Regions:
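Short, intrinsically disordered N-terminal pre-domain segments
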Residues: 1-32
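Short, surface-exposed terminal/edge motifs of secreted or surface/virion proteins that either
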Residues: 41-59
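Short aromatic-cysteine micro-motif
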Residues: 120, 124-127, 151-339
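GGW-centered surface loops in extracellular recognition modules
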Residues: 30, 60-132, 138-140, 234
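Cytochrome P450 core scaffold surrounding the K-helix E-X-X-R motif
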Residues: 142-143, 177-178, 350-361
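C-terminal, surface-exposed recognition/capping segments
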Residues: 239-243, 265-300, 323, 339-352, ...
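Short hydrophobic/aromatic-rich beta-strand motifs
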Residues: 32-44, 335-337
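Acidic glycine-/aspartate-rich tracts in secreted/extracellular proteins
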Residues: 44-47, 136-138, 172-173, 350-351
Length: 455
């Protein structure tokens, strides 16, 4: 039996394909680090077909994601872990947080010892002491009464990219000779904190090496931008950073109450438990006022021996505050010192338009473009919801598609719902208000990562 010319050519092609075939182990590695842009072979109804890997991701999300969910109608401060339980143990997104020194151009000079930063030069001569985080993906979703927060290292469908960011490791001070906002450990007169009280330098209430206060948000923004002229790369604390740090904590500890007692032990499943403790929130208001007029007293970098870790360190107040040697616990979250308590913190990238009258609205506008940050209008900002009109413990937040953490409804308690307090007041005429987070050293259980005031 003879083959036709066409049949012979087909046989030759089959033999050539077989001869040139490669084992899987012989194939080159893919380029790039996004596997979800790839095509793969699938079998459908007995026929081989190609498919984009991304089309199959809904089935893979549970393996690539970890996060939390809560029923907003339930008063418990505890939330439910969802996704890959192994990721709740390994915390890959969280473990990207690490201390570093950053130069004025935004370049990392060096990464700090993850166990203890005290061996590094942190006085500003080699850069600002910052915590690097980001370079992951997140999703905020709502289904009826259920709110979910999801993190992943991969670009799953519907997830948003969180770029690499840097946040001050300490409450900021100001380099007085240059008016530059600074994150340093430096007790010289050039980095005198507070309101720059030189006559306190030799007293127990010294503000050398302490955070700077009594500065408007406008000036905080200006001092931050002074670090690199003509650039908006440097800023004071921004709402986007504040928001993401809050959700990182909630997902890690599965609680809405950041002031849960600090606990070094893992759960039986291997998860984090507890919170960050009271923090610097337990002073007596009158005694603090008498001691130093509500100015800061915790030195920047006081907890640096904890490195990139989370924990708390005891600080003894001077006898001029209280003869009984009052003690407070300075908390740290993954390298960030005093994430709440001690002193209030201005936040940029959020403006609230508060209308007068009992039927008015307090409209929340946010912005992720630092070039549009301002204190006079809402140009370039997006309306994301309305702030609660009354003071009280937070029961509901705006949440939405971007995980907004601004209170939408009060009626909670110090151990229920969000466990943090919301301050506001209604003006006689329309007013633009900024937002303060964190609380002061005497606010006790009303403090926390979600504690905020509109001023």
């Amino acid at each position: 039996m003879a083959l036709s010319t066409d049949e012979e050519n087909k046989v030759r092609e089959i033999i050539e394909a077989f001869t040139n075939g490669k084992r899987l182990s012989d194939l080159p590695n893919v380029s790039g680090n996004n596997p979800f842009n790839l095509l793969c072979e699938v079998l459908e109804d007995g026929e081989s077909k190609k498919a984009a890997l991304a089309t199959m991701l809904p089935y893979m999300e549970e393996q690539c994601m970890y996060g939390i969910e809560r029923d907003k109608t339930v008063s418990s401060r505890l939330v439910t872990r969802i996704g890959n339980t192994a990721l709740h143990k390994s915390l890959p997104v969280h473990n990207r947080m690490r201390g570093c020194l950053l130069d004025d151009d935004g370049n990392v000079v060096e990464y700090l010892n993850p166990r203890d930063w005290t061996g590094h030069v942190r006085d500003g001569s080699r850069g600002q002491v910052m915590v690097e985080f980001g370079d992951f993906y997140c999703r905020f979703e709502t289904s009826a009464n259920i709110e979910r927060v999801k993190f992943s290292l991969f670009p799953l469908p519907g997830y948003r990219y969180v770029p690499l960011m840097y946040v001050s490791a300490y409450e900021a001070t100001v380099q007085r000779s240059t008016n530059k906002l600074s994150s340093v450990v430096n007790t010289t007169a050039d980095y005198r904190g507070g309101a720059n009280q030189a006559d306190w330098d030799t007293l127990s209430k010294t503000v050398l090496g302490r955070p700077a206060t009594q500065i408007s948000r406008t000036n905080f923004r200006t001092y931050a931008r002074n670090r690199k002229a003509g650039s908006t790369k440097w800023n004071c604390m921004t709402y986007d950073v504040q928001k993401m740090l809050y959700w990182l904590f909630v997902v890690e500890y599965a609680t809405l109450n950041s002031q849960e007692a600090f606990n070094t032990q893992l759960t039986a499943e291997g998860y984090r438990q507890g919170g960050l403790g009271d923090g610097v929130t337990t002073l007596d208001s009158g005694k603090w006022n008498t001691f130093n007029g509500y100015y800061p007293f915790i030195p920047c970098g006081y907890t640096d021996e904890l490195g990139n870790g989370t924990g708390e360190k005891e600080y003894t107040m001077p006898t001029e505050y209280d003869a009984s040697s009052k003690k407070v616990k300075v908390c740290r979250y993954r390298g960030i010192e005093n994430p709440f308590g001690h002193i209030w913190q201005w936040t940029d990238g959020i403006n609230v338009r508060i209308n007068p009258g009992s039927n008015g609205l307090s409209e929340v506008f946010v912005c992720s473009d630092p070039s549009k940050f301002n204190d006079s209008n809402y140009n370039g900002y997006s309306h994301v919801g309305n702030e609660a009109r009354a003071e009280g413990y937070v029961k509901e937040i705006i949440f939405g598609e971007s995980g907004e953490i601004i209170p939408a409804l009060v009626g909670g308690g110090s151990t229920t719902y969000f466990c943090d307090y919301h301050y506001t007041n209604i003006p006689a005429s329309v007013a633009l208000r900024g937002v303060l987070f964190g609380g002061g050293a005497y606010n006790r259980c009303v403090c926390g990562s979600r504690f905020c005031e509109f001023d």
